[in-house]
Amino acid sequence: MQFDLFVDTSRKGISMALLESDAARPRYMESVDESARGETASAMLDALLEKTGATLDQVTRVMVTLGPGSFSGLRTGVAFCEGLSFSGKRKLYGVSTLQALSCFAAEPDKAAVVIRARKDYWYLRLNEKESFIETEQVVKALKSSDVNYVVVDENAASDETLKALFSEIGAATVIDKGKPLSDWARLFERVAPSLMQEANYIQPSYFEKLH
């Protein structure tokens, strides 16, 4: 038996999942704790392994989100996954949080991702390019695109300007919560493994200085 481990600390708390990767009917177990901190990651993994009936030695691949996200969350998540992979027993894959979220759409290659960075500013992934831009720039970018889906967080889903935009362009909205992390497994074929990963700690205030 072989398992893939998915870890996301770029959003609220910790989300973690185990997927059996070499079975016709794979076992899958996920744990989400929006109040969890980095020091609880080991306990969450132990609980997942026990519930799945797996051992750490059976985990052969680890995927971790690299942000954008909070400094403390990303730092602990990346360090935790690097520690798990340091022995060389498992490969470590780092992926952009926005790239990972795009996998929640039925057709990731035809999806944009919009999540809140701060008031009136958003992180946008469109055509494999990621940006930190204002609301009016999101509107302009998506109006000139041909996306069929937009993966959004709760803030984007409730923003009146963006809601009107999504309706105008005829794109189906997909909320970024409640979807299985196993949807990210397709990214194993798109990114190269590395024992060292660099998270996107850059804060929105940095990007504002560039405009």
Please place each PLM-identified region on the residue numbering.
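Oxyanion-binding and handling regions
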Residues: 1-25, 38, 93-211
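Generic recognition of short, well-ordered alpha-helical segments
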Residues: 40, 75-79, 161
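Stable alpha-helical structural segments in soluble proteins, enriched in small hydrophobic residues
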Residues: 48-52, 81, 87, 178-190
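Surface loop/turn motifs at the tips and blade-to-blade linkers of beta-strand repeat domains
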Residues: 31-32
